[in-house]
Every structure is written in C-alpha cells, then in structure tokens.
C-alpha cells in the first residue's frame, strides 16, 4: 500500500512540473545571438534556428568558418543572418558583440552562450597565465555578454542559454583551470537565476550540461602528462571494459558526445506570466551519440529546451 501511495505521489509530482508544450512557431522571427557558432554544437544550433525562421547573429573566433555557417543558414531559410568574428579572450570583445547584435536585430530574445577555449593538459594548464586566459574566455566573457544583453532580454522577456560541461559538476584530472571555469558558470548563473526571480525579472535561464567527447587530441594530451598505462584496471575490471558499458563502437574518425544523467530537482512554478523553470525528463542512463551527422536529433531535442524556460541540472 505504501509503495502504491508513494508511486502515485511521485506521478502527481512530475505531472505537475512536466509540461512539454513546445511550439516551433515560437522561434519564428526570434532574435538570437549565438556564440561559438563556427563548429560542433554551435553550428548545429545555428542550423536549427535557421530552419525555424529565427533572425541570427553568429559569432566565433574563425571568420572563414563563420562565413560557411552563415551561407548554410541562409540556404535553410533564416530571414536574417549576420556574423561578427570576435576573440573572447579580449576583454573588449563581449560588449562589442552584443552591441553589434542589438544594432542589427533591434533587440534580443535569446542569448545562447556556447563558446569555449581549451588549454594544454598537465602542469602547463595550471600556470597562472593559462588559468587567467581560460577564465576570461570560459567564464568572464560569459558574464560580460550576459550583463550587456540582460536589459534587452528583460524587455523581451527572453531566454538566456548557457552551454556548460560535465567538468563543471565533476572534477577531472588534467582539466584544472577549465573545470574551475565551468564550476564558476554553474555558481554564477544559478545565483543569477535566483536574483532575477526575487526581482520578478522574467528572463529564463537554461543550463545545458554536456558530457565528454572522445577525441584523439584529448587522449594524446593526457598521455603526454602521465606515465600511467592508457587502460589501468580498477577493481579488477579493465578501463576499456568499464567504458564499453557506456560508449559503443564509434564511427571511424567521429567525435562522440555523451550526455550526463545529472539533471537535479525541478524548481517551483512561478507566479509570473510564464513559467521560468522546468526540468527535462531523465531516463537514468547515459546515451552516447556518435558523429555529428547522427547527432542532429539530439541537438534538436536540445534546441527544444532552448526555446522553453528549462533549467538543466541542479542548483
């Protein structure tokens, strides 16, 4: 009897918070500023917004790649697409990027922060110089972009989307300053969300926590920083056997993106004109994605979350 009662209460609890009512038409004509749009997840997000008819301003460090993405977005039907090449390591770049977007689009409905800056593994990555650079690109620039765009997002009752990493939730070897920057993102935007709620500012904040990518460059960087075998045994089980439970054989030369099951608890419903936070349903296991070509459905589901006021992860 107790089991049935608890099951019923749990079902009511999730039914109260779960509201999957995404309307693709809500993104038609939306004004979107997307960073890190030259490749990977950022590139796929740009294409998804383009298909849905959003007005786009794309930014990244590499202008040639940006031009290619802009051309593809126009072919996919984006009414307006602009780009600005910017190096987020420069303290002046974030404000100029937001100002460019405001001038071109007349305001913002979505600010999607997706850019990253990597670093060499090992002791070099822990140097003050590397840490300062990484914090500027992966954290401080996010704060600067948000601060400059927040007045426009407040006027439009828009959404702020932060693409983060599992390394911002779980400390990992050979990623010291990078992990610190991602932890800082979680703390800053988690606190900002509560501040906006207290001030009755109707801007939704979405934290997207992505898993690890299996890349040859990352493996080589780690191998150069330790003398340990590549596949050490843990409790008698080879590491290769452990990871095989989560990562199936990948497409040759493909990059793997594995989602994390870290989702956390739902937030209470708001009394404002629209609900500010919900949680994505979690199936309780890791779901690997191999190659960007077959990753598109996953990115589309991510984009659905970007159009809704979800908060992925715990606070």
UniProtKB/Swiss-Prot annotation:
EC category: oxidoreductase
Protein purpose? Unidirectional NADP(+)-dependent cortisol dehydrogenase (in vitro).
Q: Which GO terms describe its cellular component?
A: extracellular region; intracellular membrane-bounded organelle; nucleoplasm
Q: Where is this region: Disordered?
A: 221-286
Q: Write out the biased-composition intervals (Basic and acidic residues).
A: 277-286
Q: Which GO terms describe its molecular function?
A: oxidoreductase activity
Can you tell me which family this protein belongs to? Belongs to the short-chain dehydrogenases/reductases (SDR) family.
Binding residue positions for NADP(+): 36-62, 87-88, 114-116, 178-182, 211-217
Q: What is this protein called?
A: Hydroxysteroid 11-beta-dehydrogenase 1-like protein
- EC number per UniProt: 1.1.1.-
